[in-house]
């Protein structure tokens, strides 16, 4: 049995971002994920599951060391945002120029973010990726958890 300080169940974008954020902290981190992500083919058609990454998220992904990898694949700037509720009169819109920014963020396929974080975690000696794997049980001890 392997001993770790932090076990993250779920190697999606959030779980991998947490793991990569803990890199260099001195903690031994394990990430359990049901499947290994498929490599991204450059000629693959764009996927429909995307995230609107704002400037704060860009800074986080830069700090995690994956933003340049993401930009080198597929990312598209967005300059405006409009949000409304179809069942009410609620509506908001804003753009980069009115806020004094060059852009508001980027639209990025979730698989691109996920794969960049997975690759970063794979390169870390502090992070163990366990995939395919599923959590079977958690046992609480007096001084540790199994």
Predicted regions and their residues:
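N-terminal Rossmann-like FAD-binding beta1-loop-alpha1 element of flavoenzymes
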Residues: 2-31
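Glycine-rich FAD pyrophosphate-binding loop
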Residues: 23-48
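Short glycine-rich hinge loops at helix-strand junctions in the catalytic core
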Residues: 26, 65, 126
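N-terminal FAD cofactor-binding segment of flavoenzymes
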Residues: 45-86
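Conserved N-terminal helical subregion
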Residues: 76-146
């Amino acid at each position: 049995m392997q001993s770790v300080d932090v076990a993250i169940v779920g190697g999606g974008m959030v779980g991998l971002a947490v793991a990569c954020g803990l890199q260099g902290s001195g903690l031994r981190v394990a990430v359990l994920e049901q499947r290994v992500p498929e490599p991204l083919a450059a000629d693959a058609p764009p996927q429909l599951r995307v995230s609107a990454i704002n400037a704060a998220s860009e800074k986080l992904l830069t700090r995690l060391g994956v933003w340049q990898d993401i930009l080198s694949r597929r990312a598209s700037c967005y300059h405006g945002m409009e949000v409304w509720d179809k069942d009410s009169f609620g509506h908001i819109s804003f753009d980069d120029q009115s806020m004094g920014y060059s852009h508001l963020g980027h639209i990025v396929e979730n698989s691109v973010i996920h794969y960049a974080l997975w690759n970063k975690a794979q390169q870390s000696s502090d992070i163990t990726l366990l995939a395919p794997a599923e959590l079977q049980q958690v046992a609480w001890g007096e001084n540790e958890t199994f």
